[in-house]
């Protein structure tokens, strides 16, 4: 059974549609700790503002519970950011699973060039792929992003992307994984990544 964390933040429909596309139809949407602990895999989706999302996790006691899970856990977008140490968005302390901070893109642009748009929105490449999460994925594969904040490159980086500067496209530590990009919106590549996660 796949458990999707319910904390009133996240695009549940796009995630469940993506699960269905890879043949997964058994899932629950819950904030119940017992059900989360019993699940085979846990997905932490997220959209919106990091400090608000952390507050919603804390209201449910999930900010301290999620780091204790021992099965594979996948964060998506803001869900991944909440698994880092802290975020500049709302200046908030996060769960501290991944040993890095979340920063805002600085819209400086290259010297002599027009500033780049923020948020970073659209298709971009992932490189330096590590861990079985990316089994069958080619270096330089294109995935879909929508974000203004990013996890800084660190020892837990398992995929790298570049927009204005290099950043962690995905993170992994022990049984925890997180994608700054949206695998559920990344076509066949994203479907393979989700399938890989379900097979961990």
Could you tell me what each predicted segment is?
Residues 1, 27-38:
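Short acidic low-complexity segments
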Residues 22, 33-38, 65-67, 200:
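A short, N-terminal amphipathic alpha-helix
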Residues 48-120:
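Cysteine-nucleophile active-site neighborhood
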